[in-house]
Structures are given as C-alpha cells and as structure tokens.
Amino acid sequence: MRTTILGLTLALLLTPSFAGEYQPVDVTKLPEVKQTKLGLYLSAPEAYKMKSEGGANLLFVDIRTKGEFQFLGTPTVVDHNIPYMEIDDPASWDKKNNRYTMSPNSDFVGAVAALATRMNRGKNDPIILICRSGDRSSRAANLLQEAGYTKVYSVVDGFEGDMSPAGRRDVNGWKNANLPWTYKITEGQAYIP
C-alpha cells in the first residue's frame, strides 16, 4: 500500500500541468472587442466575489449558447442562461472564422427583462454577464445598455478564458481561477423561449 501511494504521489509530481497559471486581466489594456459603452468590467474572481457578497441584489446571466451552458458547465452562482447568440438552425459554416455560423438571439433583451421582472430587479440593478472569453458579453452589455440598463458588467475573461499561444484556453477565466462551477443545471436556469 505504501509503495502504491508513493508511486502515485511521484506520478502526480512528475506529470506536467496542462493548465497555465491564472493570469489576472488588466482592464486598462482590454482589446476593443471586449470594451463596453458602460465601461463596467469584472474579472472572474471579482464576479464571484460580487455575486457571493451581493447576490440577492443582482442578476448573474450566462450568455453562452444552450449547448455550451449544458455541456461545458457553468458557474455555480449563475442565476440563468440566456444566450446572446445561437448556432444557426439549419446549420451553416462560417468559412472566415472556421466554425458554425452564429446569429444574435432576437429574444435576448426581452428574456433578460422577463428574468429581471421575475426576480424583482429593475434597469438600475446590477447585471453580470459571462460568456466563454469576454467577447460576446461585451456586445451583450452594449445591447442591454441601449435598452436602458445602467449597471451591466462584463466578465472580461469569461468562463473558459483567453487562448494561450499554444491554442488552449488556459490563461484566465472562471475555470482557470478554480472558482466553483458545475455541470448540473436546473430547469429554472435553463433558457426555454
């Protein structure tokens, strides 16, 4: 038994780590695609802290596609999934970006408004948006700002984080910060238009 434990310990110590060390995001150097009109930004750890400390007063919305939400997991403190964009149905291919074509969810603002009403929140209450890496959440924040929402925060490193030079999402983000997340979602969190 002692030999087995020693062997497993050595194997773990000698195994290279595939995830990089979490790198905080410098919001003063955000690329244009992650900037919002309101200029309200949170890193994943800041979003977790804000929701944990003031969760009853704000909405935390995962705006990734239903597939991402269901199969890649979500922060445990997320209130609801409302996709900002969805993969087109029927599916088509985006040759420029080498992926399925995605289009904005025409129900996004209405679904956020309905969720806010159900949770007794108004347009001046804080909303946190999270996507994969911060690009979609910035565009969604701008859309909500145009609809009159005044405190929309974008999680600039998202759920999975930015891509490293090696092509993996292991730089930052919710998962790489080792914040609590789950594959278990509830019907109450699901986006069912």
Question: At which residue positions do the language-model features occur?
Answer:
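Positively charged n-region of N-terminal signal peptides that target proteins for export
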Residues: 1-4
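N-terminal signal peptide c-region/cleavage motif recognized by signal peptidases
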Residues: 14-17
